[in-house]
Amino acid sequence: LHTAYRRQRQMCIRDRYGVDLISLIAPTSKNRIAMIAKEAEGFIYIVSSLGVTGVRSEIKTDLDSIVKVIRENTDVPCAIGFGISTPEQAKKMADISDGAIVGSAIIKLLEKHGKEAPDYIGEYVRSMKNAIR
């Protein structure tokens, strides 16, 4: 009941403000992935691995299988995030899905460079963008 109530509340907020609810799919069973994909709107955020968000040296989750199940159940775009920090990782994720999501790496640049961060972030984002073209 709690989940149903929360979902109903989210739908009311979505409808009131005209926004999409972005579904997150973590590594889980095919049935659960299919269920979430069928209800998805906007885009699907695929969580690349379980644990705390942040920079990872490698991602070992079978993301191809997750994307395959999503594609079998919806045409809503999906992007992979959670630990993506290098241009090589971004390219790999964009090759598998519709895009790569980067958050923590940008926050680290902001924390490290303060007022000078926009230049560093701009260069970083350009390198990521160039990698996925």
Predicted regions: what they are:
Residues 14-44, 54-70:
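Anionic-ligand binding region
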Residues 1-13:
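Single conserved hydrophobic/aromatic residue that forms the stacking wall/gate
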Residues 21-24, 44-46, 78-82, 100-102:
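Hydrophobic faces of well-ordered beta-strands that scaffold small-molecule active sites
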Residues 28-38, 80, 84-100:
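Catalytic cores of alpha/beta
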Residues 7, 48-54, 96-115:
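Glycine-rich phosphate-binding active-site loops on the catalytic face of alpha/beta enzymes
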Residues 33, 64-68, 90, 122-129:
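Generic structural signal for well-ordered alpha-helices
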Residues 108-133:
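C-terminal helical cap(s) of enzyme catalytic domains, especially alpha/beta-barrels
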Residues 29-30, 51-57, 86-88, 108:
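Short, small-residue-enriched loops and turns at beta-alpha junctions
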